[in-house]
Amino acid sequence: MAAFQEILDVLPGRLQTLDFSAAQELRLRVGQAPAVLENGRERRLSGLVRPGELDGILQRATNYSAHACQSALRQGYVTLPGGHRVGVCGSAVTRNGEMTGFRTVSSLCIRFARDIRLDETALLPSLTESCLILGAPGAGKTTLLRACIRALSNSGERVCVCDDRGEISAMTDEGAQFDLGPQTDVLTGAFKSEGMTLLLRAMSPTWIAADEITARRDLEAMEQISYCGVRLLATAHAKD
């Protein structure tokens, strides 16, 4: 199987023969040349992106399911097998103050997922109390978070993951696309504050993990959870 076959399968035929082994992102904008991000640098490919090509990618990414496609457009992305993500941008449609989808799609950002493995035995000595992972965007916070979750789970801890955007687990109908360990329970689709509280009540965890803490209500929920004897593992943006 070619590298990132799950992504190649949804691309137009003219792009399926290209080598994406070093790619981090593929950006497709209507009327512009495709752009590939590799090792932090962007390079342009030949040819221009046509509107029908973006629609075709979304149809293939959702297995030609109209319901799945509409759901993807409401949340702004679709997750592929392997944990890859197709982000959507265009002319949004709103109803009662909430975005319900897109009238037209003008851009796609395809993010290439890599399940990078770190030395779990080296991580465990630092995971005795609650832990906050800080770093700049793209610094690898989520990769380190996954490794910590896996290390704790493999060591016998009961870990619950509040994965509001699905970026930690890359959950699909086939289950989590990233290995998070044998004793890990994943909640997707819920806001972090409500989701973490639900996990505390329902799943009897010893650890609760979440990605990208940004809102005050998330911090308030974490404070309340900390009073219940459960340890917390989270990430947040910070300057280098």
Predicted regions located by residue number:
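Hydrophobic positions on the alpha1 helix immediately C-terminal to the Walker A/P-loop
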Residues: 144, 148
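Conserved P-loop NTPase nucleotide-binding/switch module
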Residues: 203-240
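The conserved Walker
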Residues: 137
